[in-house]
Amino acid sequence: MKWKIKGFALVSSIAITTLLTGCTLGLNPFGEKEKMDPPDVNYVKNAKDLKNEVGKSKETAKSITTELYLVDKNGYVVPASLPLPNTQSVAKQAIEYLVQDGPVSELLPNGFQALLPAETVVKSIDVQNGIATVDFSKEFKNYKAENETRMLQSVVWTLTQFDSIGSVVLRIEGKPLTEMPVSKTPISNKLTRQIGINTETTQLADVMNSHPITVYFVASNKKVNYYVPVTRRVSNASSNDVVAVVNELIKGATVGSNLDSDFASDLALIDTPVVGNGVASLNFNQNLYTSLTDKNKTVSKKLIDALVLSLTENKAIKQVSVTVNGSKELTGEDGKPLSAPVSRPNKVNTVAF
């Protein structure tokens, strides 16, 4: 299979609520660009400006940025936000762009592939009461066994990015699927993000007395990075999922996983996190800083990004507020203060053309 690769940079923008920035992290996985331009930063100073910008985008936009869950060179299912043609059928189009050798071929970042078998037709998608029922053609069955779980994750996580979709029902030629065609993976009546993504099976064997949480680590190629969601199971005895998420991030990526983290092993919460009005407030020890001798009290951008992405997988959490020993005097790697709560970006790993 040959792909036409255009110049791109994968970016992830984390918005600081008081400024609504467009500040981005330059990411260019597996690309051959010799020099990376600094990311653009656009500040919206007030609600009137924001309204004007939104109106302008509606008038001129010929594309709509959509998260497609693709497979990377390490076999991870990864969100890549791509500019797709503007359409009223965004959910159907998103799944059509998961088909190998389809229209996504012109957009794929180097090293990424779509997962649905070539020539698969999305016959229909019906969204009712938060449930998306997807009917595929018979070509959906033409996949390798090792991609079965990845295919499920790709479809379910791509569709559930949309606010109107909470669960997914799969059909082939109008017939509901109760199991996948090749390796017979059982399928529940309604598939949600609870199926996990890039699930690590070695962490906890007791499935009945555990539940999934998803945390984000960093994959890199040379000097560029992008974020990879990983599902781990934690004991039901862990009643506080915010603490559980932080603990898993501190544990770090599994050895040999080709993933990385900026969380120090001696980093720790010094208070029980508080969640209220959509904001998770966390107070860490001084090991949150990139260096204990740094007078600017700098915090790694990769750490903040991974923390916010991981915690906001919980729909009750929209923003994350971070302090060190009770102090909000933190600085991002860009030199800007991190005193305000940080929001999840609208899209993750954006491919910029």
Task: Tell where the protein language model's regions lie, with residue ranges.
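Bimodal "functional hotspot" detector
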Residues: K2-F353
